[in-house]
Amino acid sequence: MVGRGADDADGGWGAAGVGGRGKGGAAVSVTLRSLRFGDKDASRAREMAGRYTHAVVRGVPSSMAQEGDGQVDLARAQRESGVYCGILRQKLGLQVVELPPNEELPRGQLTGDMAVVIADTALITRPSVPARRKETDGLQKLFEELKFRVCEVTDESAALDASDILFTGTEIFVGVSKWTNLRGAEMVAKTYQDYAVSTIPVSGDLHLKSFCSMGGPDTLIIGSSDAARKALKMMEQLTDHHYETLTVPDDPAANCIYARVGPKSNVLVHRSAEEFPDSAQVFQKLTDYTLVPASCTEVSKIGGCLTACAILINRKLDI
């Protein structure tokens, strides 16, 4: 177990919080903070899970066509983005804050990589790729206008991508990956001190949410690959909380948006049957959900997914 030193000055981290590698350099999972929720706290967290009021998105720049080895169909990417924003407005009832496309930010549509918002705190991340760091410009002002407490990762040794952050409602899992290092995970634990925070090793070019997401207050949607199964096993070892799991054949299809609309309606935005027909069949088992298919074939070519295309927040204020 890895914990914050009680006497660390300036919110620093003791030697126990540095590392994350086992023998032979193999990545290991660690607990950065362990907390136990009481029944009342857990019930409140479940009630708030999937509750959103706003979404922050960015338009598709023409320069996106040069990404993904030039395989991106720009016109289709723009259509898919329009449908996606329509789903956020019409199916989830969100106020959508649209940032204009910026030709200097070819991957700028992936706003969900740039920040995570939990409770009253927004954490602006620090992408490991220097060329993407300008994508965070303007977010601090936006979050301040929404009356959030705003934190920003400024440590130059930290790398943090919000697509590696999975908030379950009661705890936080952070993928330590090509895109997020242990120092970045420590910044998450430092920012959200009311929640247990654990790290999950992720290999290759994947993010943690490349193969998992929340499908309800106590439900994890998980892919079927070895990477997904290993991550799920580590989560089960690290958590004190019980989660139901819904396993889908295709890892990318495990990345969904779960939202609660109104007092009782559960909505799941998932990848379309055109893209992943076998996984779409699995979602049909969720008979008490409103299922909303959404394609993101083009944004997936630049490493994106459904959750990466918006910053979802819960704030009952007008911008």
Across the structure, where does each feature detected by a protein language model lie?
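The feature marks the mature, well-folded catalytic cores of soluble enzymes
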Residues: 2-3, 13-319
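Acidic/polar hotspots within intrinsically disordered regions
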Residues: 7-10
